[in-house]
Design a protein with these regions (language model features):
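Hydrophobic alpha-helical transmembrane segments of ABC transporter permease domains
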Residues: 40, 44, 52, 56, ...
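ABC-type nucleotide-binding domain
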Residues: 353-617
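Cytosolic ends of transmembrane helices, especially the final helix of ABC transmembrane type-1 domains
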Residues: 215, 238, 262, 309-339
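Loop segments that connect adjacent transmembrane helices in multi-pass transporters
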Residues: 135-138, 211-259, 331-336, 349-351
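Transmembrane helix-loop-helix hairpins at lipid-water interfaces of multipass membrane proteins
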Residues: 39-96, 177-184, 280, 293-297
Length: 617
């Protein structure tokens, strides 16, 4: 039975997620898609259970009246049928509670937030690189986890508090009116007083909750940032500095917690005073009516029981409302991140890219970063012929990496077009575009998975033999075979650590090269692809790279000019403009920037001049 309910709500829907709206209620409504029927069912059962509980007091009052007017011998015979009916109602309530519990806990409690995490995660995977340039990875993760749980808890609390308590309050007011309309007065006054207290405290708790959620995300982000860059922290002996950096975030989080607890304490004191007044007022009025013959003993017992129950309910409501608006604050904070519009999206008419020849054309391309008014490119024109191998050269900030990022459509151009085989990349799908381009970067990050998983990232359907062949061609198989970990795993089954931290820089770069060899895309981009390799390994890999580049369109970037001197054509960029182009010998004879850079080489690396610009964005 449990498993039947657990399978009612699909946890991992296959349809593409849609960015939810930014409004609070519209965001929550969008989150309930696929689960609304089940949420309605727990709302109905919650209302029915609340009405049932109110009816129990009426039954209890009648039983007390029967006890006061009948002898023990008469009681069973006179009221047996009614008591049997009461017993049947009590037994039937167990079925109602079972349904409510199964839907709440088996259908929704785990499946619903997991479904939201899945959808939010897919939305964040589709976000543009510019989004992650301004966000902590840990902060984004925290908001995905927190917001999913907060939406679930806010819905559950709304059902329990708003619907359940409203049904209960209506039930006991109607019951009190059936006894004597005057018995409604203390209950109604308590409801008004409690409503006023909620109106004062709850919005303030919600505002604090929003600040607290943001402070928690900032604290988590700073701590995660330190762990993710632990090598840099250790290298510069900044453990104390990082601790202080995290402490400031922790202090800010603690301040929001202190503000929250002050409000909670005041709310609890006010709530206790209201509960005391309710108990005294309701009990006193019931006893007064009994003393004047206007109410029976059963009515007095029922009213006192209702007042006691409402008093205990009020404490529960207070904590639920406090947590509800803390969750509201968490959701509002999550909305700011999870509903951001992607800066790079597929066009409505986007089609898969078809690469037949590999010609690349930059046609009057203009581009500037969002946070910089200065244009990186202003009318760049460059044609790369099918199968041509070009090398990009330039000082830092010349635009080399930006040109590659635009080709990969990590950013959209501000003007002009980039075409591959005549197809505007703005009108092809991003997945098909990047599937057609293999790239090795100098900053090689590996996934915290096995060596096999990282290699097969290049082509998941590759065979074991193809994977091992690619490793051998990249001069990686020898060190992979020697790998061992503390779990007894070896070779391709060893986990490489977060970002590949268990491997040296050269080993990571060889894995990245093997991965691109396995991908075997028609366009190849090499951004300092061999910068972390020693000369002996580089010479060995260069032969494999030459074989890999055969028949492909290649763009190579390297500060070590000897690495790209043999390319078909060298393009020299300076301040976003093409200032020289030609073969190695032609550019040396021209005596321009390339010749000067070649002359400044020291140990095979590019010596930056004093006029070199800031690091490329």
């Amino acid at each position: 039975m449990y498993s039947w309910f657990e399978r009612r709500l699909p946890t991992f829907p296959l349809e593409d997620p849609v960015t939810p709206p930014r409004g609070f209620f519209s965001f929550v409504w969008a989150c309930t898609k696929g689960a609304r029927g089940w949420i309605l069912l727990i709302a109905l059962t919650s209302a029915a259970l609340a009405a049932y509980e109110a009816a129990l007091f009426a039954m209890m009052g009648r039983v007390v009246d029967w006890l006061s007017s009948a002898t023990p011998a008469e009681f069973g015979g006179r009221h047996f049928g009614t008591l049997a009916g009461f017993a049947a109602i009590l037994a039937g309530s167990a079925l109602l509670i079972a349904l409510h519990t199964m839907v709440k806990h088996q259908v929704l409690a785990i499946n619903f937030p997991m479904r939201l995490r899945w959808l939010f995660h897919r939305l964040m995977l589709d976000q543009s690189l510019s989004f992650y340039a301004n966000e902590f990875a840990g902060r984004v993760t925290t908001k995905i986890m927190q917001t999913a749980l907060a939406v679930r808890d806010a819905l559950f609390m709304s059902v329990d508090v708003v619907i359940g308590v409203a049904a209960y309050l209506i039930g006991i007011l109607a019951l009190a009116a059936s006894f004597d309309w005057r018995l409604m007065i203390p209950l109604a006054l308590w409801a008004l007083g409690y409503g006023a207290a909620c109106a004062f405290f709850v919005p303030r708790l919600g505002a604090v909750g929003s600040r607290q959620a943001d402070a928690r995300a900032l604290m988590t982000g700073r701590i995660t940032d330190a762990y993710s860059n632990i090598t840099t922290v250790k290298l510069f002996s900044h453990t104390r500095r990082e601790a202080d950096h995290a402490r400031r975030a922790m202090e800010a989080f603690k301040a929001t917690g202190d503000a929250q607890m002050r409000l909670v304490s005041a709310f609890e004191i006010v709530n206790h005073l209201l509960s005391t007044l309710l108990l005294v007022g309701a009990s006193g009025l019931a006893l007064y009516l009994w003393m004047h013959g206007r109410a029976s003993a059963g009515v007095v017992a029922a009213v006192i029981a209702m007042a006691l129950r409402l008093s205990s309910y009020s404490h529960w409501i207070m904590w639920e409302m406090t947590e509800l608006f803390e969750n509201v604050g968490t959701i509002q904070d999550g909305i700011n991140t999870l509903t951001k519009v992607r800066s790079v999206v597929d066009a409505p008419d986007a089609r898969p890219l078809a690469v037949n020849r590999g010609e690349i054309v930059f046609d009057n391309v203009r581009f500037a970063h969002e946070d910089n008014d200065r244009a990186v490119f202003d009318g760049l024109n460059l044609t790369i012929r099918p199968g041509e191998r070009i090398g990009l050269i330039g000082r830092s900030g010349a635009g080399k990496s930006t040109l590659v990022n635009l080709l990969l459509r990590f950013y959209d151009v501000g003007g002009g077009t980039i075409r591959i085989d005549g197809q505007d990349i703005a009108h092809v799908t991003q997945d098909s575009l990047r599937s057609a381009i293999g790239m090795v970067t100098q900053d090689t990050s590996l996934l915290h998975r096995t060596m096999r998983d990282n290699l097969l990232y290049g082509r998941p359907d590759a065979t074991e033999r193809e994977m091992q062949d690619a490793s051998a061609r990249a001069e990686a198989s020898e060190f992979i075979d020697r790998l061992r970990d503390r779990h007894g795993r070896s070779g391709y089954d060893v986990e490489v650590g977060e970002r590949g931290v268990k491997l040296s820089g050269g080993q990571r770069q060889r894995v990245a090269i093997a991965r691109v060899m396995l991908k075997d895309a028609p366009i190849l981009v090499l951004d300092e692809a061999t910068s972390a390799l020693d000369s002996e390994v580089e010479v060995a890999i260069q032969r494999s790279l030459d074989s890999l580049m055969s028949g492909k369109t290649v763009i190579a970037i390297a500060h070590r000019l000897s690495t790209i001197a043999a390319m078909d054509r060298l393009i020299v960029l300076d301040e976003g403009r093409i200032v020289e182009e030609g073969t190695h010998q032609q550019l040396l004879q021209a005596g321009g920037i390339y010749a000067a850079l070649w002359a400044h080489q020291s140990g095979g690396f590019l010596g930056e001049t004093a006029e070199a610009e800031g690091a490329e964005q």
